[in-house]
Design a protein with these regions (language model features):
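Transmembrane-helix signature of polytopic, membrane-embedded enzymes
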Residues: 126-143
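Membrane-interface transmembrane helices that cradle and orient dolichyl/undecaprenyl
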Residues: 162-176
């Protein structure tokens, strides 16, 4: 499974490498607020790209359908399918899952439906909204495709829809945004978190304020003064009960933060200080960076509540797909060195991806 996946990912990235060129990435017309990844391409030029996107989607969908039954969550979904969706046993299961189970005569067809929707929405979001299509594919294939589309398939559909919907925050189109978030919520309830985020800053971010918040979160995380520790001193029963549900007790042992957590936080600060230049070429930069910052804050502030840290960090972390891709836009002069930095950030996650594929990840 690992060899097949790496071969497929390498083939996709080699064939799409021309999309990383300066000519393609800087094709957006700065005078237009509405962003199009291939804005200056004529219809005849776009068609082969979209055909290629379709072929990429087909290959990835096949990987999802015929994945190993040793992957995390595979047995759970197979058991739920046999129980008709598990609607009588799990009250938290979404109605969409029960509906798709009823529409699927076999478990493989269920996997095919979910894969088509999740991979399709991700590819559509990338080719529509990404500041650098090739780099977004690198981020997606190096980690999030395996984590979400191949394992957490319900949340994958919701996040794919949100990747497309983010453009409506900048365009100030509340109805299509809320409609898409509502559809995403039908596939996974955690998408409700994105409803109020329509009102996040969309024009600019104060680099000093947000850098200060990130640095404070770094200090709290590395000194074991994160949310779980602070919650000990809040005399509110429901907070105590909520934290206990994740920890099981009030003896907090922080998950060890590695150098990667600090590195990702400093990437956010770098993007903040270069946001003005990035926005010139990528109008969606502010909400994308906001989601990326939220992700990093979750990783740092919930370090002593590993379940929340992973769930929320990975949820908002999906926007790494765009955040890492906009990193090279900080400087046209140093575009290619910065692109290498983005690639190296992705390579840090490849060992985890291999473990997920092998079914050995903890």
């Amino acid at each position: 499974m690992e060899i097949i996946y790496l071969a497929l990912a390498a083939t996709i990235l080699l064939l799409t490498l021309p999309l990383s060129s300066l000519k393609v990435v800087y094709s957006h017309d700065e005078s237009q607020q509405r962003y199009e990844a291939l804005a200056r391409w004529k219809k005849g030029q776009r068609q082969p790209v979209y055909i290629g996107a379709g072929l990429i989607a087909i290959g990835l969908i096949a990987m999802c359908i015929f994945r190993s039954d040793e992957l995390a969550d595979y047995q759970m979904y197979e058991n739920l399918y046999r129980m008709g969706g598990g609607e009588n046993l799990r009250q938290d299961i979404e109605a969409s899952f029960v509906t798709i189970v009823k529409l699927s005569p076999t478990f493989l067809i269920l996997l095919g439906i979910y894969a088509t929707l999740s991979v399709g929405s991700h590819i559509m979001g990338i080719f529509k909204n990404s500041p650098n299509i090739w780099l977004s594919l690198v981020v997606y294939l190096s980690y999030y495709f395996v984590l979400h589309d191949m394992i957490q398939m319900r949340v994958a559909i919701g996040l794919g829809i949100i990747l497309y919907a983010v453009r409506y925050i900048t365009e100030r189109k509340i109805l299509p945004y809320m409609l898409l978030v509502g559809i995403a919520f039908w596939f996974h309830k955690s998408m409700a978190l994105f409803l109020p985020l329509y009102f996040i800053p969309y024009k600019n971010l104060n680099k000093w304020v947000w850098s200060g918040i990130i640095l404070m979160a770094l200090v709290m995380g590395y000194t074991n003064n994160a949310f779980g520790y602070v919650a000990k001193f809040i005399p509110v029963d429901f907070i105590d009960a909520y934290v206990r549900s994740y920890l099981g007790n009030r003896d907090y042992v922080a998950s060890k933060l590695g150098i990667q957590s600090a590195l990702m936080a400093f990437v956010a600060i770098f993007l903040l200080f270069n946001l003005k230049e990035i926005k010139r070429h990528y109008p969606l930069a502010v909400p994308v960076l906001m989601f990326y910052i939220i992700s990093q804050l979750c990783y740092l502030l919930f370090v002593d509540i590993p379940v929340m840290r992973a769930r929320l960090g990975e949820l908002f972390g999906t926007f790494d797909i765009f955040a890492f891709a906009m990193l090279p836009l900080a400087s046209k002069k140093y575009y290619y060195p910065l692109m290498i930095v983005s690639i190296l950030l992705c390579l840090l996650r490849v060992p985890i991806t291999i473990e997920l594929l092998a079914g050995t990840a903890m």
